[in-house]
Amino acid sequence: MEVILLERIGRLGQMGDTVKVKDGYARNFLLPQGKALRANEANKKKFEGQRAQLEAQNLERKNEAQAVADKLNGESFIVVRSAGETGQLYGSVSTRDIAEIITANGFTLHRNQVELNHPIKTIGLHEVSVLLHPEVQVKVMVNIARSTEEAERQAKGEDLTSIEAIYGIEEQPLSEEVFDDEDEAEDQA
């Protein structure tokens, strides 16, 4: 089905473009959400008549998103999850979890605005993209740790998945003298 886009949609096109999409995508998403019109002569004339108004609305939404982006850019959010000794999470942190954390900190965000290729399954600092508007994207830091104390240590740059962090720095390897004594005892026997 051919549709006329009423706003910029990633991987499809800009406002005003006539693009061919699958029927289900048009019927179930683009048309009900008001993001597109069916491409016919009547709708093309209707779109051209409303083009200036649509561009003004788009610019207003973009300016609002840019204001939020200025506040959100570079922010760091802490997610506390249980994990094993090696830093592997029991479960994962998904787009929904990240959206809930950001929303709890006073920003309005939906999970489909968080761009994550795959769920996060390890502790550490992870950079996540947030798409506030089709033309406004911002990066935030998600600090995943077992506790808030660990999150503070990670924020300072400490690697909590290293051997020293797991077993402690005081752990010393056995000295060679212990092995030498055993060898002498075996020789005497």
UniProtKB/Swiss-Prot annotation:
Q: Which Pfam families match?
A: Ribosomal_L9_C, Ribosomal_L9_N
Question: Its biological function?
Answer: Binds to the 23S rRNA.
| NCBIfam families, alphabetized | L9 (TIGR00158)
| UniProt-recorded Gene Ontology molecular function terms | rRNA binding; structural constituent of ribosome
UniProt-recorded name of the protein:
Large ribosomal subunit protein bL9
Q: Which GO terms describe its biological process?
A: translation
Gene source species:
Brucella ovis (strain ATCC 25840 / 63/290 / NCTC 10512)
> According to its UniProt record, which protein family does this protein belong to?
Belongs to the bacterial ribosomal protein bL9 family.
Q: Which UniProt keywords apply?
A: Ribonucleoprotein, Ribosomal protein, RNA-binding, rRNA-binding
Q: What is the lineage of its organism?
A: Bacteria, Pseudomonadati, Pseudomonadota, Alphaproteobacteria, Hyphomicrobiales
A GO cellular component annotation here is:
ribonucleoprotein complex
Q: Which Gene3D superfamilies match?
A: Ribosomal protein L9, C-terminal domain, Ribosomal protein L9, N-terminal domain
